Design a protein with these regions (language model features):
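Generic structural motif
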Residues: 34, 81-83, 109, 121
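Compact, glycine-rich, soluble single-domain proteins
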Residues: 51-55, 59-102
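C-terminal partner/receptor-binding element of secreted or periplasmic proteins
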Residues: 121-153
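Non-transmembrane interaction and regulatory regions of membrane-associated proteins
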Residues: 61-62, 107, 145, 149
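Beta-strand/loop substructures that line and gate deep hydrophobic ligand-binding cavities in soluble
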Residues: 102-129, 133
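Terminal, regulation- and interaction-focused segments at domain boundaries
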Residues: 13-54, 58-60
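Feature marks short, highly hydrophobic, charge-poor N-terminal signal-anchor/signal peptide-like helices
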Residues: 1-9
Length: 153
């Protein structure tokens, strides 16, 4: 009988993880600025931070225009080569290039409110452990500082 309760407990834990992980992995912040001001402020703040680079700003409203009319929506791709080099010097860590460069989303909803969405890099890094965890945790904290400069929360 106790094995049944163990299995029930495992099933419940699995369901809890299944439903809470998306809420933990993706974080949404409301911007106190307009859409254009948010994209500009985030890009400029990254450029001013030591060792950070903005690699691209992708305008999805423009890109998807032939297919659908969207509100304003973009992603900003950024990188810190110093942090990246700490991960990439070890061959066994190079598979995480699938998560590089880092990025965040900026979008305007149908009500005109502007939001920033981002992966929880610290939590993501913990899934890998070691150097990846250490570096992604530090990078995630630095990215959070940038977002706080335009966020209401």
């Amino acid at each position: 009988m106790s094995i049944i309760w163990v299995l029930v407990g495992m099933a419940l834990m699995g369901l809890i993880v299944w439903f809470t992980m998306p809420l933990l992995m993706l974080v949404k912040h409301k911007s106190k600025l307009s859409y254009d001001e948010t994209v500009t402020a985030l890009s400029e703040t990254f450029k001013k931070k030591e060792d950070w680079r903005v690699l691209a700003v992708n305008d999805y409203q423009k890109t998807t225009e032939p297919f659908v009319k969207l509100e304003r929506i973009a992603s900003i791709n950024f990188c810190n080569p110093r942090h990246a080099s700490k991960i990439l010097t070890d061959d066994k860590n190079r598979y995480v290039t699938a998560f590089m460069p880092m990025g965040l989303g900026v979008y305007e909803d149908k009500k005109g409110q502007v939001f920033i969405s981002i992966l929880n890099f610290g939590l993501l890094g913990k899934m890998f452990g070691g150097t990846i965890s250490e570096v992604m945790g530090k990078a995630g904290n630095e990215v959070t500082e940038v977002i706080k400069s335009v966020s209401t929360n």
